[in-house]
Amino acid sequence: MHPSEMQRKAPPRRRRHRNRAPLTHKMNKMVTSEQMKLPSTKKAEPPTWAQLKKLTQLATKYLENTKVTQTPESMLLAALMIVSMVSAGVPNSSEETATIENGP
């Protein structure tokens, strides 16, 4: 082998990233109190144990009806789907979702 072939090639130079500090500084200046609050925003109370139990039952029932394997991840997604449907006011013939919304 020729000695010039044995030399290692230098890695290509990386491009320097531009400084993003000004954008970060602007974001840090934003205060949540300055953001517009919607008049429909309401303060929610923490859910009761009965509401959590009912939500778990509804999520389990939903997963059984859709024949999805019951895993912690699928239970969480089913519970989030139920909560979002209730909060969005999606009509449902079941009285069970009204129980979550209004309490036991």
UniProtKB/Swiss-Prot annotation:
Protein name: Endogenous retrovirus group K member 21 Rec protein
Position of sequence motif Nuclear export signal: 49-58
Quaternary context: Forms homodimers, homotrimers, and homotetramers via a C-terminal domain. Associates with XPO1 and with ZNF145.
Main location: cytoplasm
Keywords: Cytoplasm, ERV, mRNA transport, Nucleus, RNA-binding, Transport, Transposable element
Keyword GTP-binding: no
GO molecular function: RNA binding
Note in the entry: Despite functional similarity, Rec shares almost no sequence homology with HIV-1 Rev and HTLV-1 Rex.
Subcellular location: Cytoplasm; Nucleus, Nucleolus
GO BP annotations listed: mRNA transport
Protein role: Retroviral replication requires the nuclear export and translation of unspliced, singly-spliced and multiply-spliced derivatives of the initial genomic transcript. Rec interacts with a highly structured RNA element (RcRE) present in the viral 3'LTR and recruits the cellular nuclear export machinery. This permits export to the cytoplasm of unspliced genomic or incompletely spliced subgenomic viral transcripts.
